[in-house]
Amino acid sequence: MPRSRALILGVLALTTMLSLCGGEDDIEADHVGTYGISVYQSPGDIGQYTFEFDGDELFYVDLDKKETVWMLPEFGQLASFDPQGGLQNIAVVKHNLGVLTKRSNSTPATNEAPQATVFPKSPVLLGQPNTLICFVDNIFPPVINITWLRNSKSVADGVYETSFFVNRDYSFHKLSYLTFIPSDDDIYDCKVEHWGLEEPVLKHWEPEIPAPMSELTETVVCALGLSVGLVGIVVGTIFIIQGLRSGGTSRHPGPL
């Protein structure tokens, strides 16, 4: 990716508005909804309009298809959102972006180096379907490529990626999911490309399979188990004999 590429974010306008109204730290509430997060950037004409609740995405507006996409279909049965509202907000942000670009003399945004972590959704069992999660944080500007590799080859099937989520410092984070079946023959990498990185970053993951016991270890374990069993038999026999003896001496002849 060309790092010299000029990029001014429409989110800067959003940042200004949020700063005037008070930061997220000023809010004291059991639940927080973040409505109408609008991001537009150029060149590339890339935008995003999302709604979040307690840090989780409720829906986003597909700007190409001009429709609302709910994260869970059930949400769409309980509420509705006209995608035209999101498209209008994006149009406003796009206009503001043009104004800011001229005022800044097309100054590029500062690129931050993102950080990535890979982990499984559930405890890993070989042969059992699971999901790998690549969590990428500290993204700015919100332009990034996340690619899954299996045995160094790109994987496209079973991949799902979220929208960008806004952090408190106005950087972003994003998650990429890969459904897979764990095998001791496969290794996986999450490849992250961003303007803040001098070269792509690979986060490696492979299933942790316990090493097989050696013959000596198996022999020691068997011998230990046998010894414990024999000790138990001996101790049990002693207790039985003592019980019989104490029972015999406690008997006294009754009256004639």
Swiss-Prot record:
PROSITE patterns: IG_LIKE (PS50835), IG_MHC (PS00290)
GO MF entries: peptide antigen binding
Record keyword Signal present: yes
GO terms for cellular component: external side of plasma membrane; lysosome; MHC class II protein complex; plasma membrane
Compartment(s) of residence: Membrane
Signal peptide residues on this chain, from the entry's feature table: 1-23
Region annotation (Alpha-2) ranges: 112-205
Residues carrying sugar: N145
Gene Ontology biological-process annotations: adaptive immune response; antigen processing and presentation; antigen processing and presentation of exogenous peptide antigen via MHC class II; antigen processing and presentation of peptide antigen; positive regulation of T cell differentiation; response to type II interferon
Disulfide bond entries: C134-C190
Extracellular topological segments: 24-218
Origin superkingdom: Eukaryota
Region of interest: Alpha-1: 24-111
Record topological domains on the Cytoplasmic side: 245-256
Domain Ig-like C1-type: 114-206
Assigned keywords, A-Z: Adaptive immunity, Disulfide bond, Glycoprotein, Immunity, Membrane, MHC II, Signal, Transmembrane, Transmembrane helix
Topology within the bilayer: Single-pass type I membrane protein
Region (Connecting peptide): 206-218
Transmembrane segments: 219-244
Similarity comment: family membership: Belongs to the MHC class II family.
Record protein name field: H-2 class II histocompatibility antigen, A-B alpha chain
Organism for this UniProt entry: Mus musculus (Mouse)
Lineage per the UniProt record: Eukaryota, Metazoa, Chordata, Craniata, Vertebrata
